[in-house]
């Protein structure tokens, strides 16, 4: 990348998180998402800084906005984990101490202490759980149903499927978190937070990490 331009405010640029399903943006502190087919219609005029976990969607972005810049190499997250996804790195960069849960197409759980990533695990996303039940047995092909509590044991198959799914995710998070604060992001974050008393939803968590990375790289001026 040539001499890096410096920006004084987030209003002057666009952050982009390219996922496996959707492409997410933060522009002027507003969040929105797009399918790859609709990118050109967005008509973004400002400079785009992005991260990506999907090569095909990244190519789609660059076809529409060829000057967009990948910031993956602009920062360093202290970790011994090999192959940590860039989206997980950015979310962890935004948390100094605590547990980071990204509840998207997969559910990732990462521990951060004093800015160092200690490790983590990956679970299927809620939609993948439902798909697995469907493939396992016809009777387990049940629609997703939100639960209000895990205190009451289910008395029908639909509730039993959803109960087992949610309990397995919540138990794993609680086992790793102990009494630490839990930061949730991703599409199912708000739903899972209802079962986690020490949690907070931070829908901008990945973008907060990207902002920190840009500041560390001198691209975004610190205030």
Curated annotation (Swiss-Prot):
One of its GO terms (molecular function) is metal ion binding. Keywords: ATP-binding, Coenzyme A biosynthesis, Cytoplasm, Kinase, Metal-binding, Nucleotide-binding, Potassium, Transferase. Pathway: Cofactor biosynthesis; coenzyme A biosynthesis; CoA from (R)-pantothenate: step 1/5. Substrate binds at residues 81, 85-88, 157. The keyword ATP-binding applies. It catalyses: (R)-pantothenate + ATP = (R)-4'-phosphopantothenate + ADP + H(+). Gene3D superfamilies: 3.30.420.40. It is found in: Cytoplasm. ATP binds at residues 17-24, 105. Catalyzes the phosphorylation of pantothenate (Pan), the first step in CoA biosynthesis. This is Type III pantothenate kinase. It comes from Helicobacter pylori (strain HPAG1). The lineage of its organism: Bacteria, Pseudomonadati, Campylobacterota, Epsilonproteobacteria, Campylobacterales.
